[in-house]
Amino acid sequence: MRVRWTADAADDLEQISDYIAEDRPGTARRIAMDIIRSVDALDAFPNQGRQGRVEGTRELVLTPLPFIAVYEVHDDEVQILRLLHGAQEWPTS
C-alpha cells in the first residue's frame, strides 16, 4: 500500500521542522526523519493507528514525540491528511 502526504500534511511537517530548527537545526532534521519513518510504516500496517476523532480517519500517535498523524485508509493508499501537535485544537472535518 502506498503512503501519500497531502499538501496540508507536508506543510505541517515543514512548519514543525522550521519551528524546531530555529533553536536546534540538527534536532529538527532528526525529528522530521523520525516522523517520516513512522508514517511510512503505515504502508505495511495501515490500521495500526487508533480510530480518529473525525469520522473516517485514523490517528497515528508518534510516540515519544507530541505529534499525531491524521490519515485515511483507501483501497490502495494511505492518505496523510494532517500532522498535528497533540495539544493543538483539532479541525472538525
Locate each region found by the language model.
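Short hydrophobic/aromatic beta-strand or adjacent loop that forms the aromatic wall/cage
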Residues: 57, 66-68
